[in-house]
């Protein structure tokens, strides 16, 4: 995973709190136990401060996970950490919803809130 792929642009309305929601319904990674592919939906919700994430760079960042052996919980927290570092939002939440494996589905949510 390469967080340096993430690009940003200036938020034109930094004094207004508004929520940006970006959904990737085609996220893939690899189960580190079985080596089988994991399929999920990643939802990014954030209130920007001075910067917003650029979508094409986010897409390529997500593609870095395609061949990575990584647990769901680690995917979710890694994405949150990398995006918080790049965007420095007021608030951010990552929700990862994973397709059923052995009849069990998993949803992982990780959140960040800047100190006021």
Curated annotation (Swiss-Prot):
- Does the record's keyword annotation contain Oxidoreductase? yes
Subcellular location as annotated: Cytoplasm
- Matches recorded under InterPro entries: GTP-CH-I_C/QueF, NADPH_dep_7-cyano-7-deazaG_red, QueF, QueF_type1
Source domain of life: Bacteria
Which keywords accompany this UniProt record?
Cytoplasm, NADP, Oxidoreductase, Queuosine biosynthesis
Which GO molecular function terms does the record list?
preQ1 synthase activity
- Catalytic activity field: 7-aminomethyl-7-carbaguanine + 2 NADP(+) = 7-cyano-7-deazaguanine + 2 NADPH + 3 H(+)
Its BP terms in the Gene Ontology are: queuosine biosynthetic process; tRNA modification
Keyword Flavoprotein found: no
Catalytic site residues? Answer: 31, 38
UniProt pathway annotation: tRNA modification; tRNA-queuosine biosynthesis
Record-annotated disulphide pairs? none
User: What EC number(s) does this enzyme carry?
Assistant: 1.7.1.13
Q: Where does substrate bind?
A: 53-55, 72-73
Similarity field: Belongs to the GTP cyclohydrolase I family. QueF type 1 subfamily.
| UniProt function note | Catalyzes the NADPH-dependent reduction of 7-cyano-7-deazaguanine (preQ0) to 7-aminomethyl-7-deazaguanine (preQ1).
| HAMAP family, sorted | QueF_type1
Q: What is this protein called?
A: NADPH-dependent 7-cyano-7-deazaguanine reductase
Q: Which organism is it from?
A: Chloroherpeton thalassium (strain ATCC 35110 / GB-78)
Could you tell me the gene encoding this protein? queF
